[in-house]
C-alpha cells in the first residue's frame, strides 16, 4: 500500500467528504461494532482537518487502533505523526515518525514528514529565542528605569 507524501496529507477533506466518513463511523458505533477500517478512515479524515479539535479526535482514534490492532500499526504511525505535527506536538510527532523510519528506513513519506517536523521544531525554537530576547530587552529597560529612580 502506498501512502501519500506529507505535503499531500496536508490537504483537508471537504466537509461533505468528512461527513460521509463520520456518518459511517456513527452508524457502526450505534450498531455496537465499529470496524477497524471505518475507524481508521474517519480518523484519517479528522487528522487531515484544519481544525485542531478534529485533529485531536483523529489522533485519539488512531491511538486506539495502534494499541488494539498490531497489523495496522504501520498505517497508524504515519498519521499519528502527522496529526501531532499539525497540532504542534513535535516531540510526539518525532517519536511516532522515528518508529516508522526504524521499520522502513527508505520510506519517502516518513522522510518527507521528518523534514516538516524538523522545520517546525526549528521555527518553534526561533520563536522561543525571539520571546526570550524580547523578555530580556523589557527586563533591561525595567532595570535601567529602576536604577535611574534609585539615583534620584
From Swiss-Prot:
Which residues are on the Mitochondrial intermembrane side of the membrane?
Answer: 148-152
Ranges annotated as spanning the membrane: 127-147
| Keyword Cell membrane in annotation | no
Q: Which protein family is it in?
A: Belongs to the FIS1 family.
Q: Which GO terms describe its molecular function?
A: lipid binding; molecular adaptor activity
Topological domain ranges for the Cytoplasmic compartment: 1-126
Protein name as it appears in the record = Mitochondrial fission 1 protein
Q: Which organism is it from?
A: Mycosarcoma maydis (Corn smut fungus)
| Bilayer topology annotation | Single-pass membrane protein
**Record keywords, A-Z:** Membrane, Mitochondrion, Mitochondrion outer membrane, Repeat, TPR repeat, Transmembrane, Transmembrane helix
- Which residue intervals correspond to the TPR repeats? 74-107
Instruction: Tell where it localizes.
Output: Mitochondrion outer membrane
Instruction: Keyword check for Cytoplasm, yes or no.
Output: no
